[in-house]
C-alpha cells in the first residue's frame, strides 16, 4: 500500500466534493476545480473524508495511487485556502509592476518583459521587488512562478536576478584580478 495514497483526505467546512465516475469536482469559497482521475485508481467519499484506493496491484496502479491522492488533496486545499508563491527580485534597477492580468518586469534587458497571467492565477507586486503569484490551482501557480523566475534566474557571481523567497543561491568567487592579470603567462606583453 502506498504510504501517501492510503492517508485519508479531510474535507473542510464550506467545501463540497462531487464524484461522477472518474471525474472529481471540488467546490469551495475560492472557486471550483475539476480533474479526471486515471482508471487505475478510485475515489470514495466517506463522511467528511475522501479515500483514494487502487483497483488492482499493477505497476501503473501503484504508481498513480499516491499521485492521485496528492492531486485531490491539493484541489481541496486550493479551493479552501488557495496557494501562493513569492518571488524576490534583486539587482540595481530591477523592478516589477502589475498591470491588471499582466506583469511587467524590468530586469536589465533593453526592453521590459511583459507576461500575461493564465486564467485562475493572479499576480501582485509589493515594494516593486516582491512578486506574489496566487491562485487555487497549485500546478498553475507553480508553473507561472517558474516562468517568471526563468526570465532572469539568479546568477552566481553577484546574485542578481529573480529568485523564490527563501531560495539560497550558491555564490561563486570571480576572477582574481591582482598581480599578473595584465601581463602574466600567455597574456599580452
Curated annotation (Swiss-Prot):
PROSITE patterns: RIBOSOMAL_L6_1. Transmembrane segments: none annotated. Keywords: Ribonucleoprotein, Ribosomal protein, RNA-binding, rRNA-binding. GO terms for biological process: cytoplasmic translation. GO terms for molecular function: rRNA binding; structural constituent of ribosome. The keyword RNA-binding applies. One of its GO terms (cellular component) is cytosolic large ribosomal subunit. The keyword Ribosomal protein applies. Pfam families: Ribosomal_L6. Belongs to the universal ribosomal protein uL6 family. Part of the 50S ribosomal subunit. This protein binds to the 23S rRNA, and is important in its secondary structure. It is located near the subunit interface in the base of the L7/L12 stalk, and near the tRNA binding site of the peptidyltransferase center. NCBIfam families: L6_bact. PANTHER family: 60S/50S RIBOSOMAL PROTEIN L6/L9 (PTHR11655), LARGE RIBOSOMAL SUBUNIT PROTEIN UL6M (PTHR11655:SF14). This is Large ribosomal subunit protein uL6. The gene is rplF.
Amino acid at each position: 500500500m502506498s504510504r501517501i495514497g492510503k492517508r485519508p483526505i479531510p474535507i473542510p467546512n464550506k467545501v463540497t466534493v462531487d464524484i461522477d465516475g472518474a471525474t472529481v469536482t471540488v467546490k469551495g469559497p475560492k472557486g471550483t476545480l475539476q480533474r479526471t482521475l486515471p482508471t487505475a485508481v478510485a475515489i470514495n467519499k466517506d463522511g467528511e473524508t475522501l479515500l483514494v484506493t487502487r483497483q488492482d496491484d499493477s505497476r501503473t496502479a501503484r504508481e498513480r495511487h499516491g499521485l492521485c491522492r496528492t492531486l485531490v488533496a491539493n484541489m481541496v486545499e486550493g479551493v479552501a485556502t488557495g496557494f501562493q508563491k513569492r518571488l524576490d527580485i534583486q539587482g540595481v534597477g530591477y523592478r516589477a509592476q502589475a498591470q491588471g492580468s499582466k506583469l511587467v518586469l524590468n530586469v536589465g534587458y533593453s526592453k521590459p518583459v511583459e507576461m500575461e497571467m493564465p486564467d485562475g492565477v493572479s499576480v501582485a507586486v509589493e515594494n516593486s521587488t516582491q512578486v506574489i503569484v496566487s491562485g487555487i490551482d497549485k500546478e498553475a501557480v507553480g508553473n507561472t512562478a517558474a516562468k517568471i523566475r526563468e526570465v532572469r534566474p539568479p546568477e552566481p557571481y553577484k546574485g542578481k536576478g529573480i529568485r523564490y523567497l527563501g531560495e539560497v543561491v550558491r555564490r561563486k568567487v570571480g576572477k582574481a584580478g591582482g598581480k599578473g592579470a595584465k601581463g602574466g603567462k600567455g597574456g599580452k606583453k
